[in-house]
Amino acid sequence: MKTSVMFMLVIVISLMCSGEAQEVARTYCGRHLADTLADLCFGVEKRGGAQYAPYFWTRQYLGSRGKRGVVDECCFRPCTLDVLLSYCG
């Protein structure tokens, strides 16, 4: 009896932990998007102008993300916090 209860407890705890590890994709629009980005990016160092590549190089190597923005990725479709973090800095 004790062994089966312990086994069930271990299963329940592992399921709860695995559910927390999975990041849920959500939509972020308007003020909610701006506030979430501000909270996530707080303290992230901004890039200076000298760190930017020339325009022609940037457009060539950015790929499809260069044509989309944070609104396209997170308002029109659900996105994760990792995607939002990629827009910091």
UniProtKB/Swiss-Prot annotation:
Q: Tell me the first and last residues of the signal peptide.
A: 1-19
Q: Of which family is this protein a member?
A: Belongs to the insulin family.
Per the UniProt record, the lineage of the source organism begins with: Eukaryota, Metazoa, Ecdysozoa, Arthropoda, Hexapoda
Propeptide part(s) removed at maturation, as residue ranges: 48-66
Q: What subcellular locations does the record give?
A: Secreted
One GO cellular-component annotation of the UniProt record comes to: extracellular space
Highest taxon above the source species: Eukaryota
The species is: Bombyx mori
Q: Which cysteines are joined by disulfide bonds?
A: C29-C75, C41-C88, C74-C79
Q: State the function annotated in the UniProt record.
A: Brain peptide responsible for activation of prothoracic glands to produce ecdysone in insects.
Q: What is its main location?
A: secreted
The Gene Ontology terms for molecular function here are: growth factor activity; hormone activity; insulin-like growth factor receptor binding; protein serine/threonine kinase activator activity
GO terms for biological process, alphabetical: positive regulation of activated T cell proliferation; positive regulation of insulin receptor signaling pathway; positive regulation of MAPK cascade; positive regulation of transcription by RNA polymerase II; positive regulation of vascular endothelial cell proliferation; regulation of muscle cell differentiation
SMART domains per UniProt: IlGF
Further remarks about this protein from its record: Silk worm has two kinds of PTTH: 4K-PTTH and 22K-PTTH; there are many forms of 4K-PTTH.
From the Swiss-Prot or TrEMBL record, give the protein name.
Bombyxin B-1
Q: Which UniProt keywords apply?
A: Cleavage on pair of basic residues, Disulfide bond, Hormone, Secreted, Signal
